[in-house]
Amino acid sequence: MKNFHQEIKERTGWSDAIVRFLHSREEAEIYIKARLVERRIGGRAALVRTDIDWRAFNCRQEWLKEKFADWDKWQDYNNADLIGEGWPPRDSNGDPYELHHIGQQQDSPFAELTWQEHMGDGNNAILHPNRESVIDRQQFDGEKSRYWQDRFKAFSKEEIKRIYH
């Protein structure tokens, strides 16, 4: 009988760099349901979204005026501009996409998730089975910013052309 890691590899095409960090089938199903695909971002394996609208100006949501003292600046940033500055892109509601450490180790690959995929529908307990995190949050803050900048650098010339023309 195959172990679940091998089954997930065969089903998704994800490499060992991703699959070896998975704790459970339930965790893998969250990423599969989100339709994440494997890429290398800044030299690190990651599961990335293919459904982010990079041209969208999702910071223009009215509710964000209360959250950002400098909202006037951010309203003119599309999602590609945001990640170029090291900030997460935003979904159509204006909520930022979140980065999750697959397997909850400091050197784990990242998965790009919506808040709902990350924390809602019981996913928090599935994705964070150990209540005591080993993630250095200060280091992670810097990694998140670099990750999004590296994600921008990974755009092809054709993608950049589609976003800005």
Question: What does each model-found stretch correspond to?
Answer:
Residues M1-Y97, G103-H165:
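Nuclease and nuclease-like effector domains acting on nucleic acids or nucleotide cofactors
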